[in-house]
């Protein structure tokens, strides 16, 4: 076998494996002599997916490290089983990456960084645009894979995962150089002394990325592209629930011709992620629960690895009585039920002013009942399967809690009975009225298709209700009074507040993404997100490097008198007062020259 890399991945393929994915077929038909590494049935039979029964075949090919492959980790290391939430069918199996191999990947990323950081922005842009072309050429295959592995409707796979990333790639490719251009700093009166300052931006090095399972393509790919354009290399640990999408991301970069080890994908569950943090990359970007984010931050602190954390949300939507009711109802339905509610920015608390509460609730229920539910691969489906049994049980518990606390389940509130060929991970979109902030489900993140509705009377009450949460990721304000909207928005404790919009701004790559309070630290996307991926260096220059500075040693009564007057002068910023100090500066300089 022709060795092209130094790390490997084993893949166990069964008759249930989804051979329709080019991401699998491509890896199985690499030009290297992989046939000699196959045990069991003939390789041609393996490639056709025509193996009889459930006999597993070990395909010896690499952990995807920018597409380069070698020999195999044995089956004893553990494997991830990829399952289609819609049907419960197994899609494939991916070997977990051993901890020592994760550390080695970070070291290879550091070696690749030496060369990658020297590339010009135009070269990086060409590489990113090539990756963009790969995605465009395979958009339907990628959407199908995302839908199959995450359970979401194919419409959302395209609209909320692929399209936003394509836009981000174009924006960051065209604008990274401008945003990272060296910047001069005004230094006030010091400039009169022949001094100047500027800031230049250096890439950090290796960026470790651990994304969530709910947006397995757009979250990690967007973060990786921004890191790459800033001159960094990337080690990505996809969610253990969506390992095939993670491999597809690696394949995109490989097909685009990225240099080896600039982007590496390490597959695995929690221990693999922990190993990535222990390997001390130059920054960690994590998307997931607040509890796990705190653990990652604590582990990263051992090596002083900085972190960006995008964590939980319990996002409020405030609808005033002068809002467009029809528009607000449609927005609430989409904002609450998109991706079966599995969004950190989903509408999980709807506060509506009493005057329109009945009308708005009625329209929300009517619109909810119109939604079609089923496998995400069906293009007419709006509500697909949830991701896992664990997640759907949280939703069931919250429905029970609402009911026991006295709220009313207006529609939905239960699992959909198992259909032929389908899993039991479908939960009806649920509208709840009579909710109050003291109910437990109003304080915990649900991450499911529940829309609890509360009422309020005054603007001040609405703000207080919205801020009564440990989370602060996003919020939205709905009103025809834009002065009121802006006034309320400024008071809401959230990283993003939309006015007459909801949820979608993660898909605008130019805008920063991140939260307040327990919703996380730092930002991804936008200028602010780009600044998380570089380290600023301040360069200060003295163009009149002839005479000593007046504040140098040795000190004297003359020096102290001068310093006292300089403090008052510089604090005022007055040019005239500074000029008046010139005689004392000359005297002090002569004093130093005599030493």
Where does each model-flagged region fall?
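Rossmann-like NAD(P) dinucleotide-binding subdomain of oxidoreductase/dehydrogenase enzymes
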Residues: 186-327, 456, 582
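Conserved C-terminal structural/oligomerization subdomain of aldehyde/semialdehyde dehydrogenase
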Residues: 46, 52-53, 84-93, 318, ...
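Structural signal for hydrophobic packing residues in well-ordered secondary-structure cores
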Residues: 113, 117, 132-135, 139, ...
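Residue-level signal for inorganic ion chemistry
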Residues: 88, 124, 146, 169, ...
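N-terminal Rossmann-like NAD(P)+-binding subdomain of aldehyde/semialdehyde dehydrogenases
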Residues: 36, 46, 51-195, 387, ...
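Short hydrophobic alpha-helical segments enriched in small aliphatic residues
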Residues: 13-15, 22
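ALDH superfamily catalytic-core signature
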Residues: 291-436, 499, 584, 588
């Amino acid at each position: 076998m022709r060795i092209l890399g130094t790390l490997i991945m084993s893949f166990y393929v069964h008759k249930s494996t989804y051979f329709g994915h080019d991401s699998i077929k491509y890896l199985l038909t690499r030009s290297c002599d992989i046939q000699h590494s196959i045990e069991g049935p003939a390789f041609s039979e393996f490639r056709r997916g025509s193996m009889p029964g459930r006999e597993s075949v070990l395909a010896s090919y690499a952990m995807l490290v920018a597409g380069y492959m070698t020999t195999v980790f044995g089956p004893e290391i553990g494997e991830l089983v990829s399952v289609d939430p819609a049907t419960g069918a197994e899609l494939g199996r991916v070997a977990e990456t051993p901890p020592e191999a994760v550390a080695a990947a970070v070291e290879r990323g550091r070696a690749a960084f030496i060369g990658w950081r020297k590339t010009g922005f135009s070269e990086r842009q060409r590489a990113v645009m090539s990756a963009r072309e790969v995605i465009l050429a395979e958009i339907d295959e990628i959407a199908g894979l995302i839908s199959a592995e995450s359970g979401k409707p194919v419409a959302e796979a395209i609209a909320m995962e692929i399209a936003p990333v394509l836009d981000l790639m174009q924006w960051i490719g065209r604008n990274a150089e401008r945003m990272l251009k060296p910047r001069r700093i005004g230094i006030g009166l010091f400039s009169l002394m022949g001094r100047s300052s500027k800031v230049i931006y250096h890439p950090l090095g290796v960026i470790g990325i651990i994304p969530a399972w709910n947006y397995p393509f757009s979250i990690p790919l967007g973060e990786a592209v921004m890191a790459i354009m800033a001159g960094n290399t990337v080690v990505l640990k996809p969610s253990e629930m969506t390992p095939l999408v993670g491999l597809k991301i690696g394949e995109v970069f490989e097909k685009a011709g990225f240099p080896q080890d600039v982007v590496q994908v390490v597959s695995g569950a929690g221990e693999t992620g922990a190993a990535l943090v222990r390997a001390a990359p130059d920054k960690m970007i994590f998307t997931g629960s607040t509890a796990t984010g705190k653990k990652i931050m604590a582990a990263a602190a051992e090596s002083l690895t900085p972190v960006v954390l995008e964590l939980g949300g319990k996002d409020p939507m405030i609808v005033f009585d002068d809002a467009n009711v029809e528009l607000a109802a449609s927005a609430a339905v989409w904002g609450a039920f998109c991706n079966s509610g599995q969004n950190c920015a989903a509408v999980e608390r709807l506060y509506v002013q009493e005057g329109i509460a009945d009308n708005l609730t009625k329209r929300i229920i009517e619109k909810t009942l119109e939604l079609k539910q089923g496998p995400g691969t069906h293009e007419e489906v709006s509500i697909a399967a949830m991701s896992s049994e664990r997640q759907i049980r949280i939703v069931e518990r919250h429905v029970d809690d609402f009911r026991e606390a006295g709220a009313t389940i207006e529609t939905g509130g239960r699992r959909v009975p198992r259909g032929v060929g389908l899993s039991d991970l479908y939960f009806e979109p649920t509208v709840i009225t009579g909710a109050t902030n003291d109910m437990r489900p109003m304080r915990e993140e649900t991450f499911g298709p529940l829309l609890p509705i509360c009422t309020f009377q005054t603007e001040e009450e609405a703000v207080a209700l919205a801020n009564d949460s440990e989370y602060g990721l996003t919020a939205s304000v709905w009103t025809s009074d834009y002065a009121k909207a802006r006034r309320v928005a400024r008071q809401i404790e959230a990283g993003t507040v939309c006015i007459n919009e909801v949820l979608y701004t993660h898909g605008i790559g130019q805008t920063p993404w991140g939260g307040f309070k327990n919703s996380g630290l730092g930002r991804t996307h936008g200028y602010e997100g780009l600044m998380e991926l570089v380290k600023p260096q301040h360069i200060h220059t003295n163009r009149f490097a002839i005479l000593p500075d007046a504040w140098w040693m040795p000190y004297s009564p003359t020096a102290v008198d001068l310093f006292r007057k300089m403090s008052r002068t510089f604090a005022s910023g007055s040019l005239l007062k500074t000029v008046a100090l010139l005689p004392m500066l000359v005297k002090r300089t002569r004093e130093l020259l005599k030493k």
